[in-house]
């Protein structure tokens, strides 16, 4: 199935409310491999409640279900994720209520 470029480029979401908790923050860290070595104290602050910190890359997936791409008509089993950009201006809070704005900036159909 061909990609409908105009449809995908017109998709966007504005001010979608989403919440995440400290539990989500720790689960993300565990999911990407932090905490495998119980003796590695550098990773402890990402998987344990005391002095908890958020991994910056969590911003790329934090509100995945709140986006607009469900209506894109794309078969995601056939998609290769080529690249993504992330600008970090300050550390993510360990838990928050956020507003999500998202849009597609480029599409390449190979």
Stretches found by the model and what they are:
Residues 1-83:
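Hot-dog-fold acyl-thioester-processing enzymes
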């Amino acid at each position: 199935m061909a990609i409908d470029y105009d449809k995908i480029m017109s998709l966007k979401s504005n001010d979608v409310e989403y919440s995440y908790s400290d539990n989500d923050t720790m689960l993300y860290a565990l999911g990407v491999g932090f905490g495998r070595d119980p003796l590695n104290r550098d990773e402890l602050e990402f998987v344990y409640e005391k002095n908890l910190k958020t991994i910056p890359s969590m911003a790329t997936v934090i509100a995945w279900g709140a986006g607009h791409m469900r209506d894109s008509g794309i078969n995601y089993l056939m998609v290769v994720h080529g690249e993504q950009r992330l600008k970090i201006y300050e550390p993510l809070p360990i838990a928050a209520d956020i507003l999500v704005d998202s849009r597609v900036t480029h599409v390449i159909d190979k």
